Design a protein with these regions (language model features):
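Predominantly soluble domains enriched in secretory-pathway, periplasmic, or organellar proteins
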Residues: 1-365
Length: 365
């Protein structure tokens, strides 16, 4: 059932919504997804991310050059253009107005700020648009230039920091202690480590071809990086800021999600279309399940009992039980679901459909 279809009229909301919670009643693995909202408008969402304080951000790439912000009820709060004056942020080599291309978002632990990666930058002093088939050498030959991460103040909903990272940054994550921002640079084959206190990149860690998903341990000691151009996950020590290891997970790992207690890592495998469960005590895959063609993003319920996976070419979302990775439900979406988030305020699941929709599913008893 569809409750309503939203247009683009802004409304107001408070960023001091209730704290994240586990919904009362049955656990998430005893609930089922029901479509309740379809949000349209001038959007082309690559990703969608809930703040868990009552806001949801959709990143609309270079197709719209915006980030659209909604409240947990699905009302549009603000459309944030990706335009900045780079000179005002301390980058005099890029005069005039610069556009970004918002890809993914990551909130600080208190949700006071959200960091947004930009696929490429468009303006004076920047090279050509990046590509998904680049390599460090081909990017250098083409004259590609580093991209930037924006920080957005979730109270004012305005960009207040611009941070240089690598070539075609995609995923990013903030450590639970709020100290580090970790960014995967797709074309640089490395990861940027940013000190959030100074908004400065302090390390670039080589990890392998096409790094994508990132998860960080609950104690903020270790970052896990999915190497989509391979079959492994790389570990980075967040004290030494160095690569410390690697373990096999399967072909083309894309998204990483960690269990609330940090015991297990869940991985989407883009090529095989499988979701796998890794025991982090042994770094071994202990379960896997096929969910659909061209598996992309994944989210986890607050109680840690369920996963939600989008299957890009199957046009579906699959819900899995984390204990045994069995399929609980598969629901249809629009064409090319690509992003997904779990809103801990409502227990709803939001799906970004690349062709121009956000779908909201209630996880109902």
């Amino acid at each position: 059932m569809i409750r309503r279809v939203h247009g683009t009229t802004p409304t107001t909301t408070s960023t001091t919504s209730p704290f994240a919670r586990i919904p009362t009643g049955p656990s998430s693995n005893q609930r089922h997804l029901v479509l309740i909202d379809t949000i349209t408008g001038a959007i082309s969402p690559k990703s969608v991310d809930a703040s868990d304080t009552g806001l949801v951000f959709a990143q609309n790439m270079m197709y719209r050059h915006t980030v659209t912000v909604y409240d947990s009820s699905g009302n549009l709060v603000k459309t944030i253009p990706d335009t900045v004056d780079m000179t005002a942020f301390g980058f005099p080599g890029h005069p005039g107005i610069t556009h970004g291309a918002p890809v993914e978002a990551a909130f600080t632990p208190d949700a006071r700020y959200v960091y947004v990666s930009n696929y490429s930058m468009y303006g004076a002093g920047f090279g050509p648009e990046g590509s998904d088939t680049c390599t460090p050498s081909s990017a250098e030959a083409a004259g590609d230039t580093n991209s930037y991460v924006y920080r957005i103040d979730t109270r004012t909903l305005s960009i207040d920091q611009v941070i240089e990272v690598g070539l075609v940054p995609k995923y990013l994550a903030v450590s639970p202690d709020g100290k580090w921002l970790v960014v995967s640079n797709w074309c640089s084959f490395d990861v940027s480590i940013v000190d959030t206190a100074t908004a400065t990149q302090v390390a670039r860690v080589p990890v392998g071809a096409y790094p994508r998903g990132i998860a960080i341990s609950p104690n903020s000691s270790e970052a896990y990086i999915a190497i989509m151009g391979g079959d492994n996950v790389v570990t980075i020590d967040l004290q030494s800021l160095a690569k410390t290891g690697s373990f096999f997970v399967g072909e083309n790992p894309r998204q990483l999600v960690m269990s609330p207690d940090g015991s297990y890592l869940y991985v989407t495998l883009n090529g095989p279309g499988e979701a796998v469960k890794v025991d982090l005590a042994t770094d071994q895959v202990v379960a896997s399940t096929y969910t659909g063609e061209d598996e992309r993003s994944m989210a986890i319920a607050t109680d840690g009992q369920s996963l939600y996976v989008v299957n890009y070419l199957s046009d579906t979302v699959t819900k899995l039980r984390t204990s045994d990775m069995s399929i609980l439900q598969t629901v249809s979406t629009g064409v090319h679901p690509v992003g997904i988030t779990y809103d801990a305020i409502t227990g709803d699941v939001w799906v970004a459909v690349y062709t121009g929709q956000l779908l909201v599913f209630a996880d109902t008893p």
